[in-house]
Amino acid sequence: MKEKLELWYVKICTPDFIPLDPVQFPHRYKKRQDVEIVSFLAATIAWGRRDLILRSAEKMFALTGKSPYDFVVSGEYKKLKNKNIHRTFFENDLKYFCRGFEHCYAKYGNLEKLFASSEDIWRGIALFREEMAKGNKGIYSKHISNAGEADKSGSACKRLNLALRWLVRPGPVDLGLWKSIKPSSLFIPLDVHVARTARKLKLLERKSNDKKAVIELTERLRAFCPEDPVKYDFSLFGMGVMS
């Protein structure tokens, strides 16, 4: 199984993958804060048809301009109306994220410090959700999943885990921007396609695509590569889409 996963990883994880994937958007920026913001925003709308995701992301980042970080801290986002961006994600949702980011950057300086201050990824996700709510008068967003309490069931947090994969793992596809969090601590961004492929390969037994399934699959993949289990996200994607 490891040999098969490695072969697919080498096949899929190449620079040619970048223009076909939402990861292309954070690759367009150089400033740390821009890359962080764009990673979380692009991952947040990464559901549905890939071509529509890319089109919607182009629309969203046209709104945020050359520096999404400047767009946030200048308060420029307050001029947004409430036009649709992607499926159930509207300009009001983008404003929510901008207010949350503004709070997080004022408190932590960068988002890496926010996540690195937690004991593990799940607690980091929970803290991110809490801090984003604090920037929005205590209101939670349906677009930021609830990881639940430690060791208990909760959302798979696919889109947050995807953003974290981009920011933590080294290239050529992922960004490797964050150095204080190790790839070994990441969890698989579990979508329906990856889950289906994992079950076919007997790597995942749990029927629900939730937090417990993410932990189960990541632990199975960790047996093949303890230092970087989430690399096989590319393998499972490739097997599911291309084979």
Which role does the model predict for each range below?
Residues 1-243:
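HhH-family (HhH-GPD) DNA N-glycosylase catalytic core used in base-excision repair
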